[in-house]
Amino acid sequence: MTESEARSIITDYYLAESHSADDKFLFVEAQHFLIDAFHDPVDMHNLAWFYAEERNFGLYRKYLEMAAECGFLPAFESLGYFWYYGESGTVDYGKAFYCFGRGAESRDDYLRIGCEYKIADMYRYGYFVEKDEARYKEMIERLHDEISHPENLVTIMSSEFLPDPGLCYRLAEIRADEGRIPEAMKLLRKARTQFAQYLHDNPSWWGNIDEMESVVMMMHDLSLNWDGDIDLYDLFWLSVNKNTMSFRYNGVRFTVECLEEGRNIVIRFNNKWYRDLHSFFEKAKIGGRPITAIYEELTDYEVA
């Protein structure tokens, strides 16, 4: 394999909506070739995130730590999440705080903000540091103000790495607690639109599904008499009452059934079963295309 061939394989992988087992094998081989040949921490970090999407957290950690040893600050942000959420089975808030702190030293504003807003979460919940709700709110207000003026931010990263929707969701919680419901709903609509775009662009990343669920459920909690348009992601709310949703894609009607199985809700769609909604959003496809990638092409929603 040559460098040109390896980079071509990687580019094609990132541009594809879905990946076969062969695609994944070639991607890993290409990344290994580049890492062995050039020792670039960017390639190490990219391979780490491949393993995160595959939920292989042992190899995820291995390549993050390899990149961090090279001083690559984005790897510290990722390690912060690794320890914060205990993706290896062990939560370590001390290591998470250290890693987010290292990432926050970056002169790239997207990376700095991404780390600072997780540090804010740690002050909110008292993880490793003394709980400080006032400091949390001040940090979220400040960071949201920063991202509201993107022309002032210095970055080489793409927009998906700015935690804009996550900050909108947190500020919406603050506004809702203040009784400023219209402002909270406006922030939630923005967060929902952005998470939908993230899931369109990267259907493999399950973390955005978790965030989308929080946004949708809060929107419905704040609007007891829901008068907004229904779309695919309202399944999070509809599934609570075991509703059925249908929609059209290319003129054909499809149905998503939320069915009770013991204490759980399972999903039946297109003659396949999914253990829960998260599995559905991760794996469901129509004609080989991920359901989240064709979200904007779905029309004529009905609920029963």
PLM regions and their residue ranges:
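Short helix-capping/linker turns of helical repeat alpha-solenoids
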Residues: 37-41, 70-73, 85-87, 106-112, ...
